């Protein structure tokens, strides 16, 4: 759900 390290 986070935009951080979203692959």
Swiss-Prot record:
Coiled coil: none annotated. The modification Phenylalanine amide is found at residue 7. One of its GO terms (cellular component) is extracellular region. It is found in: Secreted. Its main location: secreted. Keywords: Amidation, Neuropeptide, Secreted. GO terms for biological process: neuropeptide signaling pathway. Myoactive; induces a rapid concentration-dependent muscle tension increase. Belongs to the FARP (FMRFamide related peptide) family. This is FMRFamide-like neuropeptide PF3. It comes from Panagrellus redivivus (Microworm). The lineage of its organism: Eukaryota, Metazoa, Ecdysozoa, Nematoda, Chromadorea.
């Amino acid at each position: 759900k986070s935009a951080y390290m979203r692959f």
